[in-house]
Amino acid sequence: EVTGLTRKQLLPWRRRMQAVFQDPYGSLSPRRTVAQTVREPLDVHGVGTATERRTRVAELLDVVGLSAQAADRYPHEFSGGQRQRVGIARALALNPQFIVADEPVSALDVSVQSQVLNLIARLQRELGIAFLFISHDLAVIQHVSDHIGVMYLGKLVEVAPSGELFRKPRHPYTTALLSAVPQVRAQGSNRGHGRLVLSGDVPSPRNPPAGCPFHPRCPQVMDVCRTVAPVLKAPVGEPTRTVACHLEGTGP
């Protein structure tokens, strides 16, 4: 829990945790060169000499697939995908253990998304960095994730290994989400059951309903769902998965 830490107490954590932001156009200062942007974390934390910082910037640009000549250029001279690579290089500057990637490809063209996703996967594999990848794109999530946490109104409703979750969702909201993923089925195949359309409107997160937050739209709602909020628990026989649903016997 770091939300209660003071600015001074949080400083050591910032070296271990970094972020890649959704908007590659708004997350880079137009007045700073790429070198200044990538070097900023090193400057803030006083890492290395001026020469060592220049060397580190060149290394980081190479890691994310940008040439050394990019260092003296400005953000407006790059494409969206290249700008996001700059943002990733900045996040890597302090050798973090954990990176929050907040919708890092949603603002990019589809043709560029795969390049950035492959870069993130390579960094995760080669550098051993843990990524918290936030996205609403289920195809992207399936491509990059080892474990998936499904949230509804700011609450986790299911957490499972990626393959297990896509193969057999247990929470009704997860089931509805995955039913919206297009599937190619061979003639005569019974794989998939069509899209599950939820009724009603999404409640306000500021004033969520009592009990399970999903109960006003759940097609399998029970009386207990309207008054008692379920907690995340592992269903019987599935120790690698947790579900917050009374259907799975996960009441308090």
Model-assigned labels for residue ranges:
Residues 1, 43, 52-69, 178-179:
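Conserved ABC ATPase "signature" region
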Residues 25, 31-44, 54, 58, ...:
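Short helical segment in ABC ATPase nucleotide-binding domains corresponding to the A-loop/adjacent helical element
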